[in-house]
Design a protein with these regions (language model features):
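Membrane-embedded helix boundary and interhelical linker motif in transport proteins
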Residues: 1-28, 77, 179
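Transmembrane helix-loop junction
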Residues: 3, 27, 31-32, 99, ...
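Structural signature of hydrophobic alpha-helical transmembrane segments
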Residues: 7-18, 84, 157-165
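Transmembrane helix-bundle core of multi-pass membrane transporters
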Residues: 8, 33, 37-103, 127-130, ...
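Small-residue faces within membrane-embedded alpha-helices
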Residues: 15, 19, 23, 27, ...
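Short coil/turn motifs that cap or connect alpha-helices
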Residues: 25, 113, 123-124
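Inter-helical junctions in multi-pass inner-membrane proteins, predominant
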Residues: 52-55, 97-104, 131-171, 176-177, ...
């Protein structure tokens, strides 16, 4: 969209909506179809990469507008990278959601004991789908920051990052059994 002359803000919004929608697809596969989360997300990742190859013909997308690049990969006051500010803002929003909202409590409850959460009257499937949708938005944001940083839309960008993310979460102390953890 950016290369075809679409307004960068509209392209950004479409990217976020697409990330949300593809996250919902993952959520449906896990919550409704009852696929194992690792299998569902690994499978859809392969499908989404295949679609990226088809759309781009396997070639990088060049000529990313400079204003888009500066917005997501520029510096604020010439010192602080805007991507760091974006990460900080998103981190605060997620922290507030997890700590101070009913949805955040439901996410912890789902990770701790899904059956007890369901018996407590929580709509487990909906909350799972929303969690995956939020992850999809996060992936879309990360993809746009990477696009701005590289200055090109590489259909192979990010390959191998998924294992780095799992390792970073585990090394950072996140319980792989769920139900525990904080933003810090």
């Amino acid at each position: 969209l950016l290369v075809s002359g679409v307004n960068p803000f509209l392209a950004f919004a479409v990217g976020i909506i697409l990330g949300f929608s593809l996250g919902i697809v993952n959520g449906i596969l896990v919550a409704k179809v009852k696929l194992q989360p690792f299998i569902a997300t690994l499978g859809t990742m392969s499908i989404y990469r295949g679609v990226a190859y088809i759309i781009t013909g396997g070639w990088p997308v060049l000529d990313i507008p400079e204003n888009f690049r500066k917005a997501l990969d520029g510096d604020i006051f010439g010192v602080i990278p805007s991507s760091v500010v974006l990460l900080f803002v998103v981190g605060i929003i997620i922290w507030i959601i997890l700590k101070y909202t009913r949805f955040g409590n439901y996410i912890y409850a789902l990770g701790s004991n899904e059956e007890a959460t369901k018996l407590s009257g929580v709509n487990v499937d909906f909350n799972k789908m929303m969690a995956y949708a939020i992850c999809g938005v996060g992936a879309a944001l990360a993809g746009m920051v990477l696009l701005a940083r590289l200055g090109t839309g590489e259909p192979t960008a990010g390959q191998g990052y998924e294992l780095n993310a799992i390792a970073a979460a585990a090394v950072g102390g996140t319980s792989l059994m769920g139900g525990k953890g904080t933003m810090l």
